[in-house]
Amino acid sequence: IYPAEVEATLLEHPAVKDVAVVGVPDEEWGESVKAVVQLEGTAHASDALALELVDYCRRHIAHFKCPRTVDFIEQLPRDDNGKLYRRRLQGAW
């Protein structure tokens, strides 16, 4: 699974301002896909929105590529050049 494909799909959703997709430990599969989403200003984090984002992915890409979980964050950790600190996100889970 390429994170960029899942991220590009989620970025098309109007509630998503920025997103990072990371692999996290999973007892059943060894690792599963998690999306960490920074919302647009008018969107509000909720369980319903998390389910909507997973469903949105399933309508646009193969189910096995879609995140199993979605977490919301105020600001994704990026350096001055805009590069994502992906390991910081993975370490949080």
Regions found by a protein language model. Give the residues of each.
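AMP-binding/adenylate-forming catalytic core of the ANL superfamily
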Residues: 1-65, 74-75, 80-84, 88-92
